[in-house]
Amino acid sequence: MDEKLGKFIDDFAQLVQIAQSGQHRVQAGTQLLTTITEHLAVPAESLAVVVEEVPAHRFVDADIRMAELAAEDGQFRLVGIGGGDQRHHQSLSDMLQQSQFFPQFPLSQPDYINLAVGPDEQRQAVALGLWLFRHAGSPVAVLQRDAAPRYGRQTACLEVLAADAKNAADFLAEFRRRMQRGSILKGQVISLVMGEYGPSSGGVTFHARPELTASDVILPEGLLQKVADHALGIAAHRESLNAYGQHLKRGILLYGRPGTGKTHTVRYLLSQSAGITAVLLSGGSLARISEAAAMARALQPSIVVLEDCDLIAEDRSFGHGPQPLLFEVLDAMDGLDHDADVAFVLTTNRVDMLERALAQRPGRVDLAVDVPLPALDERIGLVTLYARGIPFSPDAVRDAAARTEGTTASFARELVRRAVVRAALDGTPVSDSHLLEAVDELMADGETLTRSLLGSGPAGGGDGQGGFGGPGFPGPGFPEPGFGGPGIPGPGIPGPGFGSVGFSGPG
């Protein structure tokens, strides 16, 4: 053998030995296996680990309950686990088994994560920590972990070890009872968000409850009260309804042109429902409807709001899983118990895109409300509302409202803003002339697209849901019975429509 080759082989063998000795090196400090074995008084590696998964939106609740249960033992300990990233990739059982041969998991400080518990509040929750305490007189060890999709862990979990399997089962039964007893989500306004790794990894966002009065919502007389009575008033008489065997769950569909006040009406409902849990879904978060319905059932009385629900009928590939999202919504609305105090509030700009099963089936949607374009009196009220604190004269407000027929609430808000902007550019106080100049500007022929973006199409239309003028495509529609009303005609190809009369194709 060549002398250089022999030396290379010897050097390489020494390198392998050094690498292997590094793997077998014992980490300094008290080891995980030793600690749990001493606490349970039996070899920890011989015990079965019981895993309890916790949804991402309930992790703060789980942290609160774990702290309560551990604190009942005045001698409890909370410790962390060292060992670098390996601890994130291995289960508690794996760590204990590996520690028999390669003790690489010394005790350290717990890992924490800051999580919201309200619009302006946060809690420091245990992200990775080992609870050592006695429950009902028996020692228990619980490893608490938050969800970490980047390490392959999609949900938070508790990994429970006890000397006797019954002790572990009793502890988890008590943990579940306390989780069902209450939640930091109850009575809050929250929206479900999509996580980077899919719906199951998403959490919740807390929102401050809106502060609105009936005078802040300008709708035709009696319309707002009708919606509020159905969404909120029924719950006030739940005992009477239950006594007569009538269901509490209800569905409300708010439909109409964009910008007419559907979302503002929802905000009013939220403002008048203090103490009621509200779950908001829109856009991508509509894929979490099943989860939202389960939360609403657990946290009732509650309201589930689905914004722009026509999207789920328009795009059947929207949902995650084998079922189209539309059918998930139907199942969620129809799957609740009759005594569940849950209100579903759906909004849509395109009622013709919703299938008959969603719009007409009793128990799913039992109140459909057309939120129309504001008439003259409503337009006066809208300009007055958005001009609070601005010295417009009543005559100027009426003139502006009269000249903006066929426009929406969003248009009225933009009209007042334009008047203020013009005054700022002129360097003068806001006056009637600025308001009327803003009317001239927004109603000019060159601002057709701007008016359309504010939900205000050409004036005119029929009794039903307003269509959009201009060339378009036919609406899909369904045969009667349905929602009648010719809408606003356009030169496009007419569609079969939703109901006996139908809609013109949207522009």
Placement of each model-derived feature along the sequence:
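AAA+ P-loop ATPase mechanoenzymes
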Residues: 1-236, 249, 466-507
